[in-house]
Amino acid sequence: MEFIIAEEGIPQNIGCQGALIAYYGSEIEFHYETVPLHGDEIFSAKLPLLELELPFWIYGRNLIFLDAYYLLAETVKIGTWDPITSILINIHMGKYASLDHWYNNISIEQDGLELKNDYDGQVLTLKTVDNLH
């Protein structure tokens, strides 16, 4: 298992060996589960300091850590690889919120976080996480 210290806003990609990623005093652990026909490994994830298994699987690509608390990840229901949904995870508290769509292109802008799906053109700008559930 690879050990990574994440940096804010820098996408992380992990391989089939899995990874333990540390970020601002918290950790998230990824364990390989499967790889779909199109590639890109999928992992189960756990927050070891909270002893919490996350109830979804996470693609091991384009993992983006934000602020001191959050991970933005591409997720799927356990046992599947589609449909993909972006979820914002507070890795310190074990809480998460679905963004109800898949956003594969993320950029940090002056007015917030711009999330875009390059395939269907949908765009979401997050200025705060206060209203996410």
Where are the language model's segments positioned?
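Repeated scaffold domains used in trafficking and secretory/extracellular systems
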Residues: 2-27, 31, 55-69, 74, ...
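Short loop/turn segments that connect beta-strands within beta-propeller blades
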Residues: 91-94
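Structural motif
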Residues: 35-46, 79-89, 121-130
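Short, charge-rich amphipathic segments
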Residues: 22-26, 43, 49
